């Protein structure tokens, strides 16, 4: 069966059981029983409890739960309670971040318009848009939102803003012509689409689709079917947690075997192995990562980037492709006059001289032959006409004043057949008709041309020169209007026959220009190893002009249209996308396929946009970024991040923040794991040597939950490093647990473990197990506090200004030092923490062993750095 836009109006009326005079109440009832209400169905939303329990799916958390259960079974209620408390706090934090349920479908539902004017029982009535049915006849005029999809059956110069749906910045001229061939959404000139706006003219349409069957409804379906994806950090932490748990279980199993071999009871050996597992697993890791990410969202909010999904903070830092919408994202979403062409000369809009007679005349005529208004910043009318009004305002020529001085005495409205508009005014005592329209149409009716020397007969050479300039403007993506005029006898009624014998005055070229920051932002992306790609519903030439101006497109061979990829297989598209930097005339489905093709190549994809048409692709992409000022609620709700200033440059800053944040999280993880590895080595060495266990469970819990958490959070707040934007994005499948990262953790843990073991032996030899355990506890605590300075950079920092530039780390170090010193020296704490109260000499010994790990690790960093530089030569 033919599509509705390919059928004659009579065929459409028969197909939907409608008629031009509208439906009767009985017909409305039958249609509603068949098609339902004009609304969108909502997806099933997760409840708070479901979201809360989903926080326990992490493999590391499951290991901790198992450890808590086993600890409780063997009587270690203290350890079990602490573990349960920590993972519960983490689950609450995660729930708070994700409890904002998706509102995309509700936004789409609201977009369909609250009310509609419709013909019912032969009369015009206004009803809630929800009550529309297929077959209804709707009446539309400038300013109306279209409440349902429909076929145009009456047209009076109707123009529709479809930018939110198709991405095309210019209002679309509608007509009733039947389209015989297949046409993309943006080229169906006889159709009206739900959620679009009437900018000019009037019309009637027969409703052909409502609710989920409209083009907006189909996008709603795509939103429901597009699955949520894990961000790179989620993937990395999941892999990391499993590997870490396996390593710890191997260590604990080895220790269990050693203790059984030494003759200990199986229950005691097993309990100790579980205790060690609890000590080794960084209970606070997930919470710390969540807290650091939360701080990141607060920082980014101050820089105009609102994070809706927590992990998107990190995900932005790892993107390798940004697929950006054109209209309103890279451009201002506002038509602006760029150039004049008068008397054979091109004049920039910035260089217009209103003291020049011809330029002032063209400015006035563009305001007079114009139906748009801009009062108190409220623009009403066609965006092209509004651009002409705004240009006048820039030069102090206000539309209201000009129109009052030269009132309109007659008009011939624009229509798609004539492609011109005419108005009649009394100017300087002459009855002047101003005609604007398409260049080729007006040149055919032009007999004279204005020049500085005076008005003379236009020649073929003049016309060819004007056409060449028109083509040049068009190749630059500019929309061009020609302006002509003639004198009409007074008291004459205008007809289309009067649009002849015209005097050519000039051309005005305009476009939706790039944002001022876009070019620099694109250059910064390229410098950072990120591939910018423009995807738009606009025309190829217009889009290519913008893409070239901002630096995305260098050659037209890098541009294509949606039709070029329509029939490509997934594999073909995967091979095709690296060669293309700009896609024009695309549909929402095309956007999803393009994003998926890049993902199949191992790229982490950002999709930016602001229209309804962007929403499904925003969800398909790894990170969806919506515009907050010009963006629809649909796009905002589908996105992981919303830019409150609609500034493409904010994305670049967000990428920089994301990269810094990911590095800071790595520093925090390095800090936690190397310290825990030091504790494991100390316990393992003591067990192998047949010595008493150096730590009581309360020692390990004190370290993990108090003196570890604060420095780890502080490391997550390390000041930004600008050099991160000179680095390439990390690989999509790169785990946090790289060989280099593991080797650093192992080496640093070895140093901390060695100093702790030496300290334990010192105290043990002085006064037995309790003093040795106290020495080991104090040394491990303080060594890990000093270790925070080791983890703040991959390079040595001990003799640099950067050592103390993190105020949060200074605070964490001071607080942690005060806590452990109080526990070791105040007599009242010795029973609670199972320590021996230390004198000043003993405390100094503990501090010395703890501090020694700092210069040793810094020396090892310096050696690694030198070896790496030598290897790069």
PLM region spans:
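Alpha-helix capping/termination and helix-coil
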Residues: 370, 602, 655, 659, ...
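Helix-coil boundary and interhelical linker segments in multi-pass alpha-helical membrane proteins
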Residues: 687-696, 760-772
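Generic alpha-helical transmembrane segments
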Residues: 707, 752, 774-788
